[in-house]
A protein has these predicted regions:
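A residue-level signal for beta-strand positions that form part of recognition/binding surfaces
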Residues: 1-2, 69, 145
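Transition-metal
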Residues: 1-41
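Extended, compositionally biased flexible segments
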Residues: 30-125
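Hydrophobic alpha-helical segments and helix pairs
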Residues: 101-156
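Conserved small/polar residues in nucleotide/adenosyl-binding loops
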Residues: 165-172
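Hydrophobic alpha-helical segments, chiefly the membrane-spanning helices
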Residues: 178-182
């Protein structure tokens, strides 16, 4: 579980959005930076559509009431876990009682906080994305508590392996032609 100690400037829960309702005047909603949101979920082997926190521009403080695996992706923010700096695009293990704090955005506007398994929240019209007049809440508030999903949708297996093959760059070729000193 995660408790919101400080809701910052503007924090919401988002997923990839709701589709097929525009003819009824319902907007797609969903995360603003799709690539970063997908990346945050994929770092945890979550489905790309798992709900996650979208933190905009500055602020936010989260208390973990249970141990969890999390990831951050997107804009470069000042982020502290128990007063120690934390980087984006890594799997981070947090313990019960840990506090994750967001300062100001250094580069970009939005950072995504994903939790292994996703956040357990109500789905409206096929999406958990917060949006005014559609979801119960449109932003997270101080003292809100969110549970981790017990039944993550389409969780990816940790056993899958991705191999990355690279070609030598011109710089690598130049280095290999240099005479070796004997």
């Amino acid at each position: 579980m995660i408790e919101i100690l400080d809701p910052g400037y503007y924090i919401t829960i988002q997923d990839m959005g709701r589709f097929g309702y525009s003819n009824y005047g319902v907007p797609q909603s969903g995360c603003m930076d799709i690539v970063s949101a997908k990346n945050a979920n994929l770092l945890l082997s979550n489905s790309i559509n798992e709900p996650l926190f979208e933190i905009c521009m500055m602020g936010g403080k989260f208390l973990f009431k249970k141990e969890a695996k999390i990831s951050l992706s997107g804009a470069l923010f000042e982020v502290l876990l128990n007063d120690k700096g934390v980087s984006n695009d890594l799997l981070i293990e947090v313990n019960k009682g840990d506090v994750l704090s967001f300062g100001r955005a250094i580069k970009g506007n939005r950072i995504y906080l994903a939790v292994k398994g996703g956040i357990d929240c109500k789905s409206v019209m096929g999406s958990s994305s917060m949006y005014r007049c559609i979801s119960e809440d449109f932003i997270v508030r101080k003292k809100d508590v969110f549970k981790f999903s017990q039944n993550p949708s389409n969780n990816l297996s940790h056993e899958k392996v991705c191999l990355l093959y690279t070609s030598p760059s011109p710089r690598d070729r130049q280095k290999s032609r240099m005479p070796s000193s004997a």
